[in-house]
Design a protein with these regions (language model features):
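Alpha/beta hydrolase fold serine-hydrolase catalytic domain that processes acyl esters and thioesters
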Residues: 4-172
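A phosphate-binding catalytic loop at a beta-strand-loop-alpha-helix junction
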Residues: 1
């Protein structure tokens, strides 16, 4: 992963304790099984629960991401209601437009990921004709990909990071 490459490149310059890498909206892109080793504890993946991108490819297909996963407040979380209006204001201040992100899409994203895992449980199933057809059907029913991608906007992540404290992040 890029985060791993960056932190590896800095290791000759300083000790590992002095290197931290923060990523945003990081998909699961490796099939190596060492992604949670202590060596990668300095990589922090900040993710939005309503963002589909960090949930793909599916972990059940054998994919993972390096480092520690930290989730922004999401619809239904205890800290969400306390911070959402502040996030919207920060977004508008930064971008000059209202925030199009729909946090309630978290339920649709959760349902889509669950259904996808049931219908296409393995990577081999994905590349089959039935897997491709199932994927297209899943996207066509009940999920507006353009609207869901609003949760992936960098401006949404930046606005959230401006209004929360470290305690507001949920680890997984």
């Amino acid at each position: 992963s890029y985060a791993d490459d960056m932190t590896s490149g800095l290791r000759p310059l300083t000790t590992l304790e002095n290197i931290s890498c923060y990523t945003f909206a990081t998909p699961e892109v490796t099939q190596f099984d060492n992604t949670r080793e202590a060596l990668y504890n300095n990589i922090f993946n900040i993710m939005n629960p309503s963002d589909l991108v960090p949930r793909l490819p599916l972990a059940s297909w054998g994919y993972a991401r390096y480092g520690r996963d930290l989730w922004l407040p999401g619809y239904g979380d205890a800290t969400f209601n306390d911070r959402y209006a502040d996030m919207q204001a920060a977004f508008e201040e930064n971008v000059g437009a209202e925030c199009p992100y729909v946090p309630e899409d978290r339920a649709q994203v959760d349902a889509f990921i669950e259904k996808l895992g049931e219908q296409i449980p393995t990577q081999d199933d994905l590349v089959s004709a039935g897997g491709i057809a199932s994927l297209i059907q899943d996207f066509a029913v009940g999920l507006d990909p353009v609207r869901v991608l609003y949760g992936h906007y960098p401006g949404v992540y930046i606005a959230w990071m401006q209004v929360i404290d470290a305690d507001d992040l949920r680890s997984s």
